[in-house]
């Protein structure tokens, strides 16, 4: 942009009175001085930390805090991740143990196929589960126990859900049914003796009308303590397992599916004593977490202050430009004052502070929100590491990735919106048509995962081969469906997506060689030829520059 002419106009309205008074009482030399001051202020604002140090001796505190925070947050996440891994492993191993303990003849990886097909097998499974529950202390190798309710132990609830009335005669193609569902429950106490006999003489006195039966549920509660955390210098947690064994006969197809669901809750143990230095280690970890919170608070304050300073300078520049050149600053130029990296760091700091507080509460056994804490700490750590890219971006050779992503993002979003319409169309079509015949298309979520893996070229043959050939028309449709999807997304849409990124990359490389297009803001700043170490950016109360804090580029 060439040097803009200073426009002096008459006062035509009350709202321009201040501007007119300024233009009428300000000499050209004073206006040039104000322009130079504004240029220096803007140039200083857009300098990198090293240049700001040479310009005013300002220490790069935010950079130092970010480097310190990366190390501390990463260490914190690793330590919590190891602890959370033990919790998840304990949950999964107990669930597998319960399936082997209470499901007769259960074998690993039978969750989708575990079922019974005769009435006697149903009774046998129920009796086996009840007997295993009553003999828990004699058969379980874990530290499992019944839930205590005062002086009594919790009972197992056996409930059957069935239609209120049902007379079904498939041979005559007739039926009479009342779809209202009724529930009948009774309880088995752990201290009661139990006799295993034939279905006709078993102690349960359970009779099932399989024509009306929908489900049979066996629900009971067990407790356990995760002692493996002691070896890692952590206090153990107490676990409550709410187990539900379901016999599903809703389809009335002759196949009753059996499943075991385990609802797990973690809580603080009531009375405990551990010898050794576990409590001391817990206190040290809480001190470390408190130091992480303090560091993030400092980072949060510094970044918020920088964002506010940017917004204030933005408003000052907009008013200055409107006052001197009677022009509005473009939105793109105004957005350059809003530093997205600082906003990302602010979000990261907030997540880290909340996650660290939760972690301290978990260590103090006041909370057991492991999953929420892991999500907060994991997301914050990811954002912290991404925030470092800002400082790498000050070097031209490392800035190519950032510039390419920034330039390509608008086009990528528009392209993905169009591609998503096609993708969702294929998802719904595959779910409805192929779902009954293909395991990978049974739910909308599974369809999306299957199609996305096909785009990456994964598991193509298995997807074709697992299609059932019970219906030739559907089998033929599946071939047309899969071939068209693969051809469209891999050879066309994915290629166009890569070409979009590649074209942006080449454009950025060309700009780096020949110069980037100048905006009004950058052109205005470029007229300031003062170097950072010229001394013209320094304020009266600035301390002298020390050569030991930063190296001149």
Swiss-Prot record:
Family named by the database record: Belongs to the transient receptor (TC 1.A.4) family. Polycystin subfamily. MCOLN3 sub-subfamily.
Its membrane topology, per UniProt? Multi-pass membrane protein
Q: Which residues lie on this side of the membrane: Extracellular?
A: 84-283, 363-371, 436-443, 465-475
Q: How is it modified after translation?
A: N-glycosylated.
Sorted keywords for this record are: Cell membrane, Cell projection, Cytoplasmic vesicle, Disulfide bond, Endosome, Glycoprotein, Ion channel, Ion transport, Lipid-binding, Lysosome, Membrane, Transmembrane, Transmembrane helix, Transport
Question: Which superkingdom, per the lineage?
Answer: Eukaryota
Q: What is the organism of origin for this protein?
A: Callithrix jacchus (White-tufted-ear marmoset)
Q: Which GO terms describe its biological process?
A: monoatomic cation transmembrane transport; protein homotetramerization
Q: List the disulfide bonds.
A: 159-185, 238-269
Cytoplasmic-side positions: 1-62, 305-341, 393-414, 498-553
Presence of the UniProt keyword Ion transport in the record: yes
**Would you tell me the Gene Ontology cellular component terms?**
autophagosome membrane; early endosome membrane; late endosome membrane; lysosomal membrane; membrane; stereocilium membrane
Intramembrane stretches, per the record, are 444-464
Ways its activity is controlled: Channel activity is activated by PtdIns(3,5)P2 (phosphatidylinositol 3,5-bisphosphate). Inhibited by lumenal H(+) and Na(+). The channel pore shows dynamic behavior and undergoes spontaneous, Ca(2+)-dependent modulation when conducting Ca(2+).
UniProt subunit comment: Homotetramer. Can heterooligomerize with MCOLN1; heteromeric assemblies have different channel properties as compared to the respective homooligomers and may be tissue-specific. May heterooligomerize with TRPV5 to form a functional distinct ion channel. Interacts with GABARAPL2.
The written remark on domains in the entry is: The most N-terminal extracellular/lumenal domain (referred to as I-II linker or polycystin-mucolipin domain) contributes to a structure with a four-fold rotational symmetry in a tetrameric assembly; the structure contains a central highly electronegative pore with a 14 A diameter. The pore is critical for Ca(2+) and pH regulation. The protruding structure formed by the I-II linkers may contain all the interaction sites with lipids and proteins in the endolysosomal lumen.
State the name under which the record lists this protein.
Mucolipin-3
One GO MF term: intracellularly phosphatidylinositol-3,5-bisphosphate-gated monatomic cation channel activity
Q: Where is this site: Interaction with phosphoinositides?
A: 305
């Amino acid at each position: 942009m060439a040097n803009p002419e200073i426009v002096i106009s008459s006062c035509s309205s009350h709202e321009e009175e201040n501007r007119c008074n300024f233009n009428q009482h300000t000499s050209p030399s004073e206006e040039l001085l104000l322009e130079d001051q504004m240029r220096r202020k803007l140039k200083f604002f857009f300098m990198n930390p090293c240049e700001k140090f040479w310009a005013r001796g300002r220490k790069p505190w935010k950079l130092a805090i970010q480097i310190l925070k990366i190390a501390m947050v990463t260490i914190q996440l690793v330590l919590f991740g190891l602890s959370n891994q033990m919790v998840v492993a304990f949950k999964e191993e107990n669930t597998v143990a319960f399936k082997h303990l209470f499901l007769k003849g259960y074998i690993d990886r039978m969750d989708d196929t575990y079922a019974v097909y005769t009435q006697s097998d149903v009774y046998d499974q129920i009796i086996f589960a009840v007997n295993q529950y009553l003999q828990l202390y004699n058969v379980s190798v874990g530290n499992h126990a019944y839930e205590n309710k005062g002086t009594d132990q919790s009972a197992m609830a056996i409930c059957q859900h069935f239609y209120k009335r049902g007379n079904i005669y498939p041979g005559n193609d007739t039926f009479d049914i009342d779809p209202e569902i009724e529930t009948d429950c009774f309880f088995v106490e752990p201290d009661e003796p139990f006799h295993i006999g034939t279905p006709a003489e078993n102690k349960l006195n359970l009779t099932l009308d399989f024509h009306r039966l929908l489900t049979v549920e066996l629900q009971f509660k067990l407790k356990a303590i995760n002692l493996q955390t002691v070896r890692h210098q952590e206090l153990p947690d107490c676990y409550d397992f709410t187990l539900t064994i379901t016999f599903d006969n809703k389809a009335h197809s002759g196949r009753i599916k059996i499943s075991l669901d385990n609802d797990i809750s973690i809580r603080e143990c009531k009375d405990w004593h551990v010898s050794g230095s576990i409590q001391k280690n817990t206190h040290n970890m809480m001190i470390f977490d408190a130091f992480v919170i303090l560091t993030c608070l400092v980072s949060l304050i510094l970044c918020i202050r920088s964002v506010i300073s940017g917004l204030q300078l933005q408003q000052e520049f907009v008013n200055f430009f409107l006052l001197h050149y009677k022009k509005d600053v473009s939105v793109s130029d105004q957005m350059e004052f809003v530093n997205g990296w600082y906003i990302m760091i602010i979000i990261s700091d907030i997540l880290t502070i909340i996650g660290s507080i939760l972690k301290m509460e978990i260590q103090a056994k006041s909370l057991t929100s492991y999953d929420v804490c892991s999500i907060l700490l994991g997301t914050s750590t990811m954002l912290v590491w991404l925030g470092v890219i800002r400082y790498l971006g000050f070097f031209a050779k490392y800035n190519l990735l950032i510039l390419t992503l920034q330039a390509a993002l608008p086009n990528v979003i528009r392209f993905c919106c169009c591609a998503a319409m096609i993708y969702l169309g294929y998802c719904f079509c595959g779910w409805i048509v192929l779902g009954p015949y293909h395991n990978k298309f049974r739910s909308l979520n599974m369809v999306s995962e299957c199609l996305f893996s096909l785009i990456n070229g994964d598991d193509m043959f298995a997807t074709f081969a697992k299609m059932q050939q019970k219906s030739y028309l559907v089998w033929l449709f599946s071939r047309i469906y899969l071939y068209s999807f693969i051809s469209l997304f891999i050879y066309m849409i994915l290629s166009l997506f890569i070409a979009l990124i590649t074209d942006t990359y080449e454009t950025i490389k060309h700009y780096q060689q020949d110069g980037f297009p100048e905006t009004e803001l950058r052109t205005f700043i470029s007229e300031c030829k003062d170097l950072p170490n010229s001394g013209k950016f320094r304020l009266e109360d600035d301390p002298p520059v020390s050569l030991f804090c930063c190296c001149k580029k």
